[in-house]
C-alpha cells in the first residue's frame, strides 16, 4: 500500500470518526433536513466565506479559532477528544464543530489541522484560495475529471504540508454532475512528518 493511500486512511479516518455527516451514507445524508439546511447555508455564503474563513483561522490560538468558526458557521463545539499518533509522542485534540467541520489542536493550543466535509470541487477551490493555497495542475485535472465512486486527491504544498480532498460522500441534488469532497488541511509540518513516520 502506498504512503498516500495509508495517509488517506488516517486522514479520512479522523474525519469519519468525528463527523456524523461522513459517517452516514449518501442516501441517509440526502434525507437529513438539518444536513441539507446546513449545506445550503454554506452554499449561500460561499461568495463571501473564503476571506472570512481565512480571517477566522488563527494558527497560534486554537481556542480563538474554534470560537471564530463557531460564530462564522453558527455551529457549536459538540465534542473534544484527546488522541495520539500510534508510533509517535505527538498528542493532539480533535474538536468537532457542528455537523461538517473538525479542528485538530496541540496541547499548547496551536492549530494542527482543519477539515470540512460535504464540499463540491468548486467550493474546495474557493476555500483553498481563501487560505492562500493555489491548487496545483494535478489537483485541477482530478477535480475536473469524471467522478469515481471513491476519489482521493493529494496535494503537497510548501506552506501547508498535506492537503487532502476528494473523499466523495454522495451527490448534491442541486448539482448531480458534481461530486462531493472533503477538505483536510494540515498546517503543522512536524505533525505531517510524524504521520509519515507512522507509516514507514
Annotate each PLM feature:
Residues 1-8:
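Bacterial N-terminal signal peptides that target proteins for export
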Residues 10-18:
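Bacterial N-terminal signal peptides
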Residues 19-23:
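Sec/Tat signal peptide C-region and signal peptidase I cleavage site
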Residues 24-39:
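Cleaved targeting-peptide boundary
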Residues 50-59, 111-118:
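Second-shell loop/turn segments in exported
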Residues 55-94, 100-101:
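N-terminal secretory signal peptides
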Residues 96-155:
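Long, charged/polar, surface-exposed segments that mediate recognition or autoinhibition
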Residues 184-200:
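Short, low-complexity, Pro/Ser/Thr/Gly-rich segments in the mature regions of secreted, periplasmic
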